[in-house]
Design a protein with these regions (language model features):
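Intrinsically disordered, low-complexity regions enriched in serine, threonine, proline
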Residues: 7-10, 17, 60, 164, ...
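Acidic, low-complexity, intrinsically disordered interaction modules
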Residues: 30-155
């Protein structure tokens, strides 16, 4: 069976409406996302049949609602939104996971580039994370890591919460089939 590649856009499509709204709100509040925000405003204008000027005049919450209502967004926007969301709302979870892996970080941000976690530590780190934080938040975070750097985080594919996201909808894993 061919493995489906998980992308930020696919992850966006699979999020619940409320979760997508929280991610979109963090995206509009990210001061470093101006270029992606401009692209998102044009996308909203196009999809909702608004003038770009109208979208630009909306407050962040209204833009977030409009963006969250789009079933499909480009990988660049979805990826940036997911990063903004985790940095804004889930630094404690990010830090706890990196601590569990023994990876040096600054409040959840990995200090060095090109860090590859020890695959043997991942199951325990995920278990600890799952005991401290809501399942949907953990699942979204782990899948975001895998989307952002599939080579470094390849071992996450073996984690049940992540592996379920990689299967095409409706397909059972080998473990589920018995």
């Amino acid at each position: 069976m061919t493995e489906t590649m998980l992308t930020p856009s696919r992850l966006w499509r699979r999020m619940a409406a409320e979760q997508r709204h929280r991610v979109a709100r963090a995206f509009w509040q990210d001061e470093e996302a101006a270029e992606d925000q401009a692209q998102a405003m044009l996308l909203i204008a196009q999809q909702k049949k608004f003038r770009p000027k109208t979208v630009a005049a909306l407050d962040d919450d209204r833009r977030a609602r409009h963006l969250a209502s789009l079933a499909t967004v480009p990988n660049t926007i979805a990826g940036r939104a997911l990063i903004a969301y985790h940095l804004a709302e889930h630094r404690a979870m990010m830090a706890a996971f990196l601590d569990g892996l023994g990876i040096a970080h600054d409040n959840g941000l990995i200090k060095e580039e090109h860090v590859k976690p020890d695959a043997a530590k991942i199951p325990d780190a995920v278990k600890q994370l799952s005991q401290k934080f809501p399942e949907e938040d953990v699942k979204l975070y782990l899948n975001t890591l895998l989307c952002q750097d599939p080579d470094a985080w390849a071992a996450l594919r073996e984690v049940p919460a992540v592996a379920g996201e990689l299967r095409p909808e409706g397909m059972a894993s080998a473990a589920e089939r018995g």
